[in-house]
Amino acid sequence: MLSLQNQRQPKTTPLTDDYVTSNTVLGYGINGKVVQCTHRRTQQNYALKVLLDSERARREVDLHWRVSGCRYIVNIIDVYENTFKDRKCLLVVMECMEGGELFQRIQDKADGAFTEREAAQIMHEICAAVDYLHSRDIAHRDLKPENLLYTTTQPNATLKLTDFGFAKETFTSYTLQTPCYTPYYVAPEVLGPEKYDKSCDIWSLGVVMYIIMCGFPPFYSNHGLAISPGMKNRIRTGQYDFPDPEWTNVSQAAKDLIKGMLNVDPSKRLRIQDVISNKWIAQYNAVPQTPLCTGRMLKEAEETWPEVQEEMTRSLATMRVDYDQMQIKALDKSNNPLLTKRRKKIEEMELYMANATRN
């Protein structure tokens, strides 16, 4: 079984000697649920992740523990190795991210209050976390909004990356070949038998940035399928666009950066050093304060977004492309369900207002 290579080793004393656990569920990771716990001496609240002991669980804890010193990665406070009902478990105590998920924070902003400059600052923080990982030859492999959490509800809160359930070292004799991914954020090379590496994280960064800028993903699935042949083809061929009116006022610099991250050829795709040194990221304070429609789009798609998140999660680590069954489909902008729903609402509202005016 994989040992925890970090110099620190799990404590074998009972977790309950130091912490009081609760039934309050804070979230669910790839390999286990997260509940709230409280330190007995300090009364400080923390997040507790419970993992059944396995090679995969130990790899997750090992990699996360190694990088938890980064300001933009959720910090591990303690790790315990305890036994419950004859089953060995790893109990991971982490800082409690009281500010919630990235997109919920954006959605809660007033219409027009979220700007391109704020988007650039968010991307700067996410890229700092990825840069820290990649410089240590670790690929996260599950970059998505649900894994980006704020420390507090305050305006100056820090955004941090969490959930290392799919993380993997990239300097070993093998390269990443296991298709662990979330459909909306999956890189083209992950969909096929080709080997892939840290460049798949850059692709995911591009998709996350796209959604941050407008409130909907560049690639989507048709007919409610977790990942359709058409969606796979759009990802493979890089078929997406920047539709109006949502992208009308977004800077060309932002669009160019997204294009660089979504290049279908991993050898030509930007590296994290290229992304983090890009002027739009590095000098985010100079980015124009153009109002974005992201918050409004997320609110108007509030009913749809949880379904999108579920769709993303359903196909994690389960998809392999069957090339013989691949069907080539042309991109049709109007088929994006998130955009279609929003525009239908706008048309209905305009019709209502027109009728009200006539009356």
UniProtKB/Swiss-Prot annotation:
Gene label: MAPk-Ak2
Tell me the organism's taxonomic lineage: Eukaryota, Metazoa, Ecdysozoa, Arthropoda, Hexapoda
Supply the source organism for this entry: Drosophila melanogaster
Q: Name one GO cellular component term.
A: cytoplasm
Which InterPro entries did the record assign? CDPK_Ser/Thr_kinases (IPR050205), Kinase-like_dom_sf (IPR011009), MAPKAPK_C (IPR027442), Prot_kinase_dom (IPR000719), Protein_kinase_ATP_BS (IPR017441), Ser/Thr_kinase_AS (IPR008271)
Q: What SUPFAM superfamilies does the record tag this protein with? A: Protein kinase-like (PK-like)
Q: Which PANTHER family match?
A: SERINE/THREONINE-PROTEIN KINASE
The UniProt keyword set, sorted, is: ATP-binding, Kinase, Nucleotide-binding, Phosphoprotein, Serine/threonine-protein kinase, Transferase
| UniProt protein name | MAP kinase-activated protein kinase 2
Q: Which protein family is named in the record?
A: Belongs to the protein kinase superfamily. CAMK Ser/Thr protein kinase family.
Question: Coiled-coil segments, which residues?
Answer: none
Q: What is its EC number?
A: 2.7.11.1
Q: Where is the Protein kinase domain?
A: 20-281
Q: What does this gene product do?
A: Its physiological substrate seems to be the small heat shock protein (HSP27/HSP25).
User: Which reaction is recorded as catalysed by this protein?
Assistant: L-seryl-[protein] + ATP = O-phospho-L-seryl-[protein] + ADP + H(+); L-threonyl-[protein] + ATP = O-phospho-L-threonyl-[protein] + ADP + H(+)
> Can you summarize the PTM annotation of this record?
Phosphorylated and activated by MAP kinase.
Active-site residues annotated for this sequence: 142
Which residues bind ATP per the record? 26-34, 49
GO terms, biological process = intracellular signal transduction; negative regulation of mitochondrial electron transport, NADH to ubiquinone; positive regulation of cell size; regulation of JNK cascade; response to salt stress
